[in-house]
């Protein structure tokens, strides 16, 4: 097998591994609050929203130490061990306890930072300037399929269920745990790409022997340097402007991945189909993500009009989804009790409207994320690692904040926050894109 084919195979394995892991994890996140509300045990007092807030809070802080962990144990082992912690979190729902629920929420926050740092390193190692776009598109598409498969399983498993029984919960989460473990094991199939220059290995080995005890000091110095560059980059004008939209992506991530499914599941108007609609909603979010990822990721090289039109599409479809949700969904849906809500909004709700909103949420999310990754790569080609570290930090902090307030705010207040950040974030993105375009035109003169 040629080196290029080996690298492509590694990317495919990486994408399939993440697809399995996040099929299990995202499905767990979508149904966590609904499952907890249906628990028969009175000794469990956890909150799915609080758990996800803890995960994203710890994830934010752990981005500072994740590169050091990956440097010490390597990409492959980092992804495998992180995958085991993901599996442990999912397995906890088989027999949940409050202490294990929140303890694993902390551990999986650390695992998430290590996992995504290792993923970025693995993608870079197996790509070059001519293949990074294609490889990123392949990985994105495979990852987004995770939204489809797990939620299809939930839809089929819970169709017709009003309350989730203990046996149904155990069956679902045993299956999800196995799926997550399969994804973790797949990382061991990734092989280090062969060097085009055989002498490079000899030079590297000789250098490693010569450095001896200096290696640890060198790694520490590199970690400190990367941390300093991240701090400097975070206060640049472009990054401060982009941070508004990055924060919005964290807020809307919380909404479509945790809050919206819970709202659907709490609506008594859907009767026996309410719980299974959670899974079907996740499927339609995934369809929107895959469609957007294909159009703006894999076909991005044919985009001659810049990034602004795609971002405009994103804000239009998201605001349309928010308006429809405001019209059909009762305001107490996010914080309804186990019995659900009997309130009505302004129009009669329907499954068609609910699923159409799910699709629009996924499509809009893919618009924002593909263009955000693109503009960061264009702005900071020589500082991509610090740039994406800042991106993940801001996104995860805003997601954590959103999960905290989701426990208390009525739906219309949550939608208002999304609209405000979405509007001003889009405007700030335009300013950065226009500045980048003018700079490119000036350099080409």
Curated annotation (Swiss-Prot):
Bilayer topology term: Multi-pass membrane protein
Q: Which GO terms describe its cellular component?
A: membrane
Q: Which Pfam families match?
A: UNC-93 (PF05978)
Q: Which InterPro entries match?
A: Ion_channel_UNC-93 (IPR010291), MFS_trans_sf (IPR036259), UNC-93-like_regulator (IPR051617)
Q: Which residues are glycosylated?
A: 40, 163
Alphabetic keyword roster: Glycoprotein, Membrane, Transmembrane, Transmembrane helix
User: What is the protein name stated in its UniProt record?
Assistant: UNC93-like protein MFSD11
